[in-house]
Design a protein with these regions (language model features):
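Outer membrane beta-barrel transmembrane domains
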Residues: 51, 127-128, 247, 253-367
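Short glycine/proline- and aromatic-enriched beta-strand/turn motifs that initiate or cap beta-hairpins
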Residues: 43-82, 114-129, 297-305, 321
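Extracellular loop and loop/strand-boundary signature of outer-membrane beta-barrel proteins
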Residues: 132-137, 191-196, 232, 311-315, ...
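Long, hydrophobic/aromatic-enriched structural stretches that serve as scaffold segments
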Residues: 97-175
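Short loop/turn motifs that connect adjacent beta-strands in outer-membrane beta-barrel proteins
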Residues: 43-49, 80-113, 154-161, 214-227, ...
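Transmembrane beta-barrel strands of outer-membrane/channel proteins
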Residues: 52-58, 115-123, 164-170, 210, ...
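Sequence/structural signature of outer-membrane beta-barrel proteins
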Residues: 57-61, 124-128, 169-173, 213-217, ...
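Residues that define the transmembrane beta-barrel architecture of outer-membrane proteins
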Residues: 66-72, 141-145, 160, 200-206, ...
Length: 367
């Protein structure tokens, strides 16, 4: 018999061709297309969501009233945008401000971008509330009222934040009035030495911070863990420092973001990053996790310890290295997130009797 000239692969090719046109394959192919389309639509929908954050920090949680005694900040985070100047997702007044801050925009293309606008206040006091005279061996009274503009650029597992905070230190920051209001409300004794506070001075601080993330089993509702590192720097007459640190989280439905936010510059990192985040599922999904974090700073300037920049004022001997350690818990339900952290801070100046601690409460809503 003549030898067959048919290719040894012809049977396999015919089988593949028949499989590709079979009804079962077409059915699964169409289902896959629909699934991809729905995921893409969900991705587009989540990019249109805004995030509003409220932070309240106070040493009342530690039953003290001294050093960094109170802080509050309200932050508004935009949806993902293509650029900071032309995006119609941003109000006109924000785009106009952004045109003057192009240095902070960065040059990377095709990444997720967000604009952050914030307003806040921080208050610092010495330990002795009854002393009306200047206390030489304790920190100055000071208030800091500020507005911030930040720009975030996100890649998978990475976040870069550039933020500029501008405001005023001194009586114009209304630190005394804010503290007196709260103390009257709660029936606490007032601090009597506010006449010795730092003088009025315009303040600014520019911050860059880079974060990177390593995850394990954090998607869906499973138990998971992740680790988030950060490093950055701050320059300004209010603060100048180098910093580095990390956060470790473990729990159920850990949010797909870059950790637990704080009032410190560059600390805004809780914006949802993908459709897998519990706040984007649309079915009131819940999540619960605990976290431990630390931040180590090499401090070159701190107006709240070094005193006024251009005028003679009270000052203390600042420590060059300061560390924060925080432990806390965070709960998510639907688009809302509530977190509490207790922060332990090492001594900030040599005359300080002991380390300081305070509580930080954060409420975030994505809508």
């Amino acid at each position: 018999m003549p030898k067959s000239t048919r290719s040894p692969w012809s049977t396999d090719i015919r089988w593949v061709r028949e499989a590709l046109i079979s009804p079962s394959f077409l059915k699964w192919f169409l289902l896959s297309i629909l699934l991809l389309a729905s995921t893409a639509q969900a991705d587009r929908d989540q990019r249109e969501k805004w995030t509003l954050n409220l932070y309240v920090e106070n040493d009342l949680f530690s039953e003290t009233d001294q050093d960094y005694t109170s802080g509050i900040r309200l932050t508004w985070v935009s949806p993902d945008i293509s650029n900071y100047v032309d995006s119609e997702a941003l109000p006109g007044w924000v785009r106009r401000i952004n045109r003057g801050l192009t240095f902070f925009h960065g040059s990377h293309k095709g990444l997720k971008r967000n604009v952050i606008v914030s307003i806040g206040q921080q208050i610092y006091t010495p330990q002795d509330l009854n002393q009306t005279m200047l206390i030489d061996d304790d920190r100055p009274y000071a208030g800091w009222l500020f507005m911030g503009f930040g720009f975030q650029t996100r890649a998978p597992e990475q976040l870069d934040t550039l933020e500029l905070r501008i405001g005023v230190v001194g009586p114009a920051a209304f630190g005394r009035e804010a503290q007196d209001f709260i103390h009257d409300l709660r029936g606490f004794d007032k601090f009597l030495g506010w006449d010795n506070q730092l003088r009025n001075e315009p303040g600014f601080v520019a911050v860059w911070e880079h974060k990177w993330k390593r995850t394990r089993g954090v998607t869906g509702s499973r138990f998971g863990m992740d680790a988030i590192g950060h490093a950055g720097l701050a320059l300004g007459n209010v603060r100048s420092h180098l910093n580095t640190g990390a956060e470790f989280r473990a729990g159920w439905s850990i949010p797909d973001d870059f950790g637990t936010s704080a009032i410190r510059p560059g600390g805004e990192n809780s914006t949802p990053d993908s459709v897998w985040d519990p706040r984007f599922t649309g079915n009131r999904k819940w999540g619960l996790h605990t976290f431990v974090s630390f931040d180590l700073r090499l401090v070159g300037q701190d107006i709240f310890l070094d005193g006024n920049t251009f005028k003679k004022s009270h000052e203390v001997t600042r420590e060059s290295v300061v560390a924060d350690v925080a432990i806390g818990i965070s709960y998510i339900y639907g688009g809302a997130r509530l977190s509490y952290a207790h922060i332990f801070r090492t001594r900030e100046f040599s005359q300080q009797d002991h380390s300081h601690s305070y509580g930080s409460m954060a409420f975030s809503y994505t809508f």
